[in-house]
Amino acid sequence: MVDGWIILDKPLELGSTQGVAAVKRNLRQAGYGKCKVGHGGTLDPLATGVLPIAVGEATKLCGRMLDASKVYAFTVAFGTETDSLDLEGGIVATSDVRPPLADVHVTLGAFRDSIDQVPPAYSALMVEGRRAYDLARAGETVELPSRRVTIHALTLDSWTGSEGAVETATLTAHVSKGTYIRSLARDIARALGTVGHVTMLRRLKAGPFAIEQAISLDKLNALGQGAPLEHVLLPLEAGLVDIPALDLDPEQARAVRQGRVLTGLPFEDGLYWARLGTVPVALVELSDGNLKVSRGFNLQDVAE
């Protein structure tokens, strides 16, 4: 049984489901049989970077990854807006306005907050049972409601053009779940009195996983050709490092695995991952000293 995470540095034009399929294929070729595999958050085909792929018991944590904040680097080209808000779409608006650098700095400051954002028409959101991007590609008008998202940080890394007329801006954004970077780029451009679209998008972090932990598709494919699994697999608990651990004794671990509520624990309320030694037992919620299991992990090394 294989349990853990493979963090793929997703290449351009590879879909998230194709990334999952590549992991399944390589595990099968390496002799690990049929493994349960899922990803922790869709990444656009035209984006690159961190794609957390869960294997085995780690798939129980995919929901946490979907809810986690993300960090992206992206480039906005001013003067042209496309229907997809990236390089793939057709041009729907143009502008001769190129914002002054000083205005870019001021405008970015206004976006570092909770904001209302309308997702792109070309998105995987469901509209009356159909994907929004399917409707958009069919030429239908797609109207999506705005949603509240949070931009925790937004910085200007580099730019082209002149101080009086910025042509492109490369930014880094730390954002809450549900944030669309293409929409953020659109809204920044419009706030600057022009239009724009994304020409580069790279995810640098998803939840606890950073780009430094990601492997290339070539390194993943080496697994199917005999490379050691430990060269690509992170342990299940790598997806839990952003929350505190709670150490259990063998009797407590047995109770948790049986679904019993533990009481009288001297810890603050909140989310923990319970462990026996170094082995994850469960994702748990503590309230008033009472422990309740949110997700149990069926790992063989847990003491009975």
From Swiss-Prot:
The alphabetical list of record keywords is: Isomerase, tRNA processing
- The entry's active site is 44
Q: Which GO terms describe its biological process?
A: mRNA pseudouridine synthesis; tRNA pseudouridine synthesis
Enzyme class per UniProt:
isomerase
Keyword DNA-binding attributed: no
Catalytic reaction annotation: uridine(55) in tRNA = pseudouridine(55) in tRNA
Q: What is this enzyme's EC?
A: 5.4.99.25
Pfam families named in the record: TruB_C_2, TruB_N
> What's a Gene Ontology MF term here?
RNA binding
The record's InterPro entries line, in alphabetical order, gives: PsdUridine_synth_cat_dom_sf, PsdUridine_synth_N, tRNA_psdUridine_synth_TruB, TruB_C
Transmembrane region(s): none
Q: Name the family.
A: Belongs to the pseudouridine synthase TruB family. Type 1 subfamily.
Q: Which HAMAP family match?
A: TruB_bact
What is the purpose of this protein? Responsible for synthesis of pseudouridine from uracil-55 in the psi GC loop of transfer RNAs.
Q: What is this protein called?
A: tRNA pseudouridine synthase B
Q: According to the entry, what is the taxonomic lineage of the organism?
A: Bacteria, Pseudomonadati, Pseudomonadota, Alphaproteobacteria, Sphingomonadales
